[in-house]
Amino acid sequence: MRTSPYRPRGHQDGTLWTLRHAIGATVAVSAAVIALVTPTAAANAAPHNPSPSGGAAGQDTVTTHTGATTAQEQDRVNRYWTPERMKLAGALVPEITPVPEDDNTPDDPHPLPANTPDSGAVWTHGGAVEKNVGRLFFTFSDGYDGSCTATVVTSVNRSTVITAAHCLRGVGSPSVDDTWNHNFYFVPGYRNGTKPLGGFSVRTMATSSRWDTDPDTTESSDVAAAGYDAGLLVANSNAGGHPIEDVTGSQHIGFGEPVEGEFVHAFGYPAYGLNDPGDKYVGSRMIHCAGTSHPGPKVPLLWGETCDMSAGSSGGPHLAHFDTRTGIGTVVGVTTTNEELAGGQTPTLYATRLGDSAHRLYDWAQWCQ
């Protein structure tokens, strides 16, 4: 499917439908992916000089964009994202769309048994993942509000957040200001319209140059771009001057480790189910999937697990080596597309493998001050 005939729950990252239009928090059109990588601690994160990667034509460099850098702009963004606006992000017509109901699924104080398959249920087991994964809100160039999922990762500046490139800007669009989304606001641990750990505006962001240089709209170009669907953000400190990692903790991040056949956990804030498009999910709670990873039949660079998450889950982490007692693992990929693009079986949530290109973005982000 090349484009969705409607914006499912608005722009809540329609990403799970095609890279070019389903991106974001029910963004516009792309979906979910799972990238697989090797653990990398911030303490060992010296600048990386990767070898040229294959894929789209042209050199793979870092394309950056400035967000809220002044106190005035940061305050404006903070005031823009009211509890009601956050709940409605992704609604096609906010004026007549009812506010989604709260999800009051009770928490479970017991850790989830290791290697327990899950095709999509509210995460109730607490742990670090409930603090450093959250909902990333933004406004599209056409004025609609959308949301994706993002994760705080261990970094030198303690301010680095990873999501999908398509949550930041559309694939194939030129790198000019009006092609980027704006009003970026990350709420770690988002739950039923609340900000348990506060909200963080974004001061700068980056995607691979190979994400924006291909103007083609064919399926093959989407497949090529999928390998570069990672975006890095640098969050502003909170009102107390604390960097986000000091508030939320972080997940490890890894690059280049294949995980075929490994047990992987995926998290996200979907607005609806991939195979159950009703109100199975409403973006109010973090959803969890877990299972043995497998490559996409048509796109081996994409890996995924059985999962019913759809729009809104884009950018969410796929975690290897996940400890269900502590809620800590290693981000090896971020959700980017569904089985339609990858050629897998329904329902499968796919992520792009974090490789040299993502490592380059991460190095750029973690040294930003």
What name fits each language-model region?
Residues A128-N192, I287-P297, T306:
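Catalytic histidine site
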Residues V332, N338-Q369:
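C-terminal cap/linker of serine protease catalytic domains
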Residues T82, L136, A150, S159, ...:
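Terminal peptide-recognition signature
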Residues D308-V334:
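Catalytic nucleophile loop of clan PA
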Residues A226-A230, V234-T306:
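Chymotrypsin/trypsin-fold serine protease catalytic domain
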Residues M1-P47:
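Secretory targeting and sorting signals
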Residues R2-S4, P39-S155, Q369:
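Protease-domain processing segments flanking chymotrypsin-fold serine proteases, especially trypsin-like
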